[in-house]
Structure formats: C-alpha cells, structure tokens
C-alpha cells in the first residue's frame, strides 16, 4: 500500500481504459484518477510486483492511495481481505500477465464478484492492459493452451491453441 491506509469514499464515474500492453499511457491513467474522484486505486495481477504504486501515486498523483494485489491462485482469489480491498476501490486496473492465470484463478471467485461489483454497482473506472484488457469482455481468448499468433488463429480458427470463452466470467 502506498498512501493513506484509511478508506475514503469519493464520487466516481464509470468508464473503461483498454490498453494494448506496450507503454503505459499517462493520459489514460490520469483519466481513471479523475473519474475515481481521487479515491483509492487498486491494481490486481497474478504475477509481478507493485511497480504501478510509485507511478500512479507519485508520478501522476491525485489518489488517496494505491495498492497492488498479487492474486496468484484460487486461494488468494477467495481471500476476504483481497475482496474487501477491491470493493473499497474507487478505481481498478488489471495489469499485464497471463490471461489463463486470470481466468483460471479468478473465475467463480470473490475477485470476480468484487470486479463485477465495482463495474455494475459502484460504477468506478476500470482498466486493463494486455492480459488485463483481454479478460474485460463477454468473449475472451483464455490462453488455456498457450499463446497463438494471429496468423495461426486466422488460418485455423478451430485449432487446438484457440481457446475462446463467452459470457462466463466478468459481467461487463
């Protein structure tokens, strides 16, 4: 956690940042921060560290706090503390990673419930980059059998590596 550990409640505006996975775009994060009303910003991922904390809190500023949760398995995805941290967020960002980890660990869990709450009840800005973007839709490539190139998928959309799911994860 970077910033104030005390929870704040701000007026938020819903919206989505769908980022490709290369360089982070300051303007996109600033847009999320503005729509969060300067509240608590949460980043979720399955691997990695808290590199977004100094970027959002110090470099961009304007948030009460930022916390990164590394949710690396089913047990972590059903942790009540992770759930509470997520539902208390005024902005949520899903970091780069492996979308199979996200689908496998987070689907049918408290993390999924918390993200759906933020989107559909609390109406906060939500963003994702790379794998975090890939799962923010009704249909998504889950990468269950590894990566597939565009040329492979287009030449054989029914190939063994093409694993696509529909309407069974996040309710966005």
Over which residues does each language-model region extend?
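Extended, subdomain-level signal for the structured scaffold at the beginning of enzyme domains
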Residues: 1-101
């Amino acid at each position: 956690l970077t910033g104030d550990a005390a929870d704040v409640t701000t007026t938020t505006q819903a919206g989505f940042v769908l980022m490709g996975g290369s360089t982070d775009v300051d303007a996109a994060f600033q847009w999320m921060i503005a729509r969060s009303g300067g509240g608590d910003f949460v980043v979720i991922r399955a691997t990695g560290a808290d590199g977004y904390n100094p970027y959002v809190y110090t470099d961009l500023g304007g948030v009460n706090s930022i916390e990164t949760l590394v949710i690396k398995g089913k047990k972590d995805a059903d942790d009540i503390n992770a759930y509470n941290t997520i539902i208390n967020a005024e902005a949520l960002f899903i970091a780069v990673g492996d979308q199979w980890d996200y689908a496998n660990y987070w689907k049918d869990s408290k993390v999924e419930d918390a993200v759906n709450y933020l989107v559909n009840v609390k109406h906060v800005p939500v963003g994702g980059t790379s794998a975090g973007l890939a799962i923010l839709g009704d249909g998504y490539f889950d990468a269950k059998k590894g990566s597939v190139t565009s040329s492979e998928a287009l030449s054989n959309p029914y190939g063994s590596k093409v694993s696509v799911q529909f309407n069974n994860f996040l309710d966005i």
